[in-house]
Amino acid sequence: MQKLILDTNVIVSALISSSIPSKILYELVLTEKVEICLSEEVLVEYLEVLNREKFSKFTNFKTKAEVVLNRLREIATFYQTDRKIEVLTDTSDNKFLELAAVSAADYLTTGNTLDFTITEFEYTKILTPREYWDNYAPKE
């Protein structure tokens, strides 16, 4: 089974609109067709970002976010990150590379191409949601 890491912006996009990120989240992750990799640091970022007031303008955002976060807690494989990595200029995003290193995830999907300027880190390919969906997502 593929191991996948979702950057926070992919989850936000999935909750806001029907799009490729929502297909990844609802059709692959939450149905356990891929293994979602998490660390406490990444989960904390998910919680902080998804609880921002600016998202309250989207219908049922908070409710959908709570459901998704609860489900992720149930199904994710949690990893203890034990290595500090300093590769990305936005240092707050390095936690995703730290998770990639310890989990040996196959893919990290992000919409943040400004900060994620690398396409691979150790064993993990770094892809936009579209690249992942079109080329690597498991198909039934």
What are these regions (language model features)?
Residues D7-T8, L38-S39, N112, T128-P129:
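A secondary-structure boundary/capping signal
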Residues L28-R83:
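PIN-domain endoribonuclease scaffold, especially VapC-family toxins
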